[in-house]
C-alpha cells in the first residue's frame, strides 16, 4: 500500500532527523516521493517541489502528522473494504473528522492538512471518492461530496480536473437536495481556482448555470459557496469567462447575495465577485447596470476587517486564510482603476494580514508584491476607506506607512517634490532636483532628455522606472485648479491611463470644446503624447463627442424613471426584495430599490421622487412588514410614507406576500388602509419562475386594484388583502 510505504519512509527520515543535524546545516532536507531532494518533507511540500520550512514549524508539523497519519491510514483501509452503505458512511465520517481537525490547527494547519490531503490522493482515496459520488445512495453522495470539498488542495484539484470533472458536473445537474448542493457548490468553488482552462470547461458544461440557479435559494452556507464560486470564477477564468458570466447575468444574481442583511461574509464574497467583473473593461458597463457594484464601497466602509478575520479563522474551511496564489489575485485588484476593486481588495488583504500575522507568515505579502501596491494606495488614493484599510494592513505586516501624496501636484513646491522622490525610492537624485529647483509644474512637464542631461539620470532603465512612477502620479493627480472643462475625467473615461496627458493638454490651453480641432502632430509635439495609438483614440473620441451632448442633469431623466419601485421592510424583506429586483430586471423591467447609498439629507426626497416616477409599486409584505406602520399617525415610518405616496399618485400597487399575517384594517392609519383593497400574490421560493410570471401579468395588466374587498377580479392564486 502506497500510504504504508510513505509512512515508513517518513518514520525513517524522522529517526535520522532526531540524531541531530550535520554541522552547518540550518534546514531539514528530506527526499520527496519523486526521489529528488527537497527542503521539507513530502507532506509539507505538497508534491510541488522543495521549499524551506523553519525548524520550529517543521517539528510541529511532523508531530501532528505522526499522530494523524496512522489513524488516516486505518480509516482509509476500512473505507476501502466497506460494502454496506452504513459502513461507508462511518468511514467517510472518520476521514472527514481527521481532515477537519487538521485544518483547524493554529499556525500549522495548512501544512498538516496538506499532508493528509496528499496522503488520501496517493493512497487512492481521491479516486475512491469520485466513485462514491456516483453511488445510488443519496447519503453516500452527500458525505463523499462533503469530504471531497475539504481535501481539494492544489494537487487534488489537478487530479479532479483530469479525471473527475464529469462526475462533479453530473452532481451539479441534480440541483437538489440542499445538503448535496452545499458541498457541490463548495467543490465548484475550489475547482474554479484550478486554471483558466478548467474554468472554461466548467462554464461550458453547466457548472456556472448551477451556481447561478442556487443563488435564488435561502440556505446561508449554500449562498456563501455560490458567492465564493462566482468570485473565483471571475478571478481565475480570464476575460472570456468573465464575458460569459456577464452574458448569463451573474452580476445581477450577485445582487441578492450582496444585499443580504443577515450574513456579512456572504455580502463580502458577493461584492468581491462583482468588483472583479467590473475590472474587465469589455463588460464594465453591463456590470454597472446591474446595480450590484453600488453596494461594494458602502459595505466595506461599514465593516471591520479584524472582525472579518476572526470569522474566517473560526470557520474550518477558511481557518488558514488564503494561499499565495489567491492572495496574488487580490493584489491585482489594488492595481485596478476601479474604486470598488481597490476597496474590496484592500479589505480582504487587511483581513489576510491579520491572519498571517497570527501565523507568523507575513513574508508572503512581500513575495507577491502586495507591500508596494498597499503603499501606493496610501500615497495616492483619494478614498478614505481604501487608504485607511491599506494603512492598517501595512501596520499589521510591520511595514512603514508612507505619507499621503497631496493630489494637487501642479501646485507642489520643491519640498513636496523632494518628499515624493524619497517615497518612490529615488532619494539619490534629490540633490539634483533641488539644484534645478524642480517644482510640481516642472515635474509634470519633465522630458526624458531633461531627466538625462539636466538631472543626471544616466541609466535608461532607471529613467524608465522613474517615468513609470511619474505616470502613476499623473494618473492619480487632481487637476481641478487648471482643468476647467473636466478634461481629466473625460480622458479617464476613455482609458484610466489617459489621465496622465491632462496637464500637457491644459498647459497648451486646450479644453474639451477645442480638442477636436487639434491635429495628431500637435498632440505629439506640443502636448507630449508620444504613443500614436493613444493620440488616435483621443482624437477619435473628441470628434465623436461633437455628435453627442455633454452630460447634464436633464440627460439622466430616463435613468431616473423606473418601471418598478420595490418597497420592503429591511429586517425581514430584503432578500425577497433583492430577488424580485433580479427577476424583474432579467425580464426587461427597470427597477428602483433603496441600497442605502442615498446622499445625506436627500434620503426622503430621493425615495419619494422615485415612487412618483415609477409606473408600478411592488410592496413586499414579509413577516411584520406593517408593524411599524401601526400607530404611526405622523407618517414617520418609511414604508408608511412610500405606501401613502403610491396610493395618492394612483400607482399600480402589487403586494407580494411572504410569511405575512394580515392586520385588522383599523390597526393601520387611515391614510394607508386603502392598500388592503389590492390583491396580493403569495411568493413561492420553490416555484419562483411561475410566481414571477404572475407578478409580470399584474404589472402589465393592472389587475390588482379592487374597489371592494369582496371583488371577484383577483387572479387565481392571488390573495385578497384584508380578508380572512
Curated annotation (Swiss-Prot):
Phosphorylation at Ser-548 by JNK kinases (MAPK8, MAPK9 and /or MAPK10) enhance the NAD(+) hydrolase (NADase) activity. Phosphorylation at Ser-548 and subsequent activation takes place in response to oxidative stress conditions and inhibits mitochondrial respiration. GO terms for molecular function: NAD+ nucleosidase activity; NAD+ nucleosidase activity, cyclic ADP-ribose generating; NADP+ nucleosidase activity; signaling adaptor activity. The active site is at residue 642. The modification Phosphoserine is found at residues 548, 558. Widely expressed in the brain and neurons (at protein level). Expressed in photoreceptor cells of the neural retina. It is found in: Cytoplasm; Cell projection, Axon; Cell projection, Dendrite; Synapse. CDD domains: SAM_SARM1-like_repeat1 (cd09501), SAM_SARM1-like_repeat2 (cd09502), SARM1_N (cd24153). GO terms for cellular component: axon; cell surface; cytoplasm; dendrite; extrinsic component of synaptic membrane; glutamatergic synapse; microtubule; microtubule cytoskeleton. Residues 412-476, 486-548 form the SAM domain. The keyword Amino-acid biosynthesis does not apply. Residues 24-56, 703-724 are annotated as: Disordered. Residues 703-716 have a biased composition (Polar residues). NAD(+) 1 binds at residues 103, 110, 149-157, 190-193. Belongs to the SARM1 family. This is NAD(+) hydrolase SARM1. It comes from Mus musculus. The gene is Sarm1.
